Amino acid sequence: MKSLKEIILESKNVHHYVDAIIINPDNELLLLQRAGYIKQFGGKWGFVGGSIDNKDKSPKDALIREIKEETGIELTFNENHAIKQLYKKNHLDNDGEVVSDTEYFIVELESKPEVKLSREHSRYKWFDRNSIKEKQNKCVPDVFNIIQRYYENN
């Protein structure tokens, strides 16, 4: 059963998104650089993620689908991949109304997979805790803050 808050958010045409903080066994974090032709934040580094579609049964289903579409990495619930929610953020318009929300999930991999980028992205890189700082000003807004939140909790 949906909560009142969920019903209210859905009735306002709120867009729902998921993002994955993908971590390999070396404790490196995967970021993708958006292709230059992308209107919103083209050329910026960000997480794997996207919209939750009507066909997705849950945010985790959307996350698994987006990871496969954007990186070629296939995850299933049968495998030993840890997927846990880190944070959920509401995005507001100028009137303070919620227009979208993003759920951020940590995805811990058992191996360092081959990444096959979609055409939405031009590059990818696995970053350790120190090297990620060099991209701080080249990231999509909030990405670096979410990364800091991850490291504070892990």
Which sequence ranges carry the predicted segments?
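Short acidic, low-complexity intrinsically disordered linear motifs used
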Residues: M1-I7
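Short connector loops at helix/strand junctions that flank enzyme active sites
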Residues: H15, Q40-G42, F47, V98-T102
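Unchanged
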Residues: I52-A82, L86-D142
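Charged phosphate-binding loop/patch that engages nucleotide di/tri-phosphates or the phosphate backbone
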Residues: P141-N154
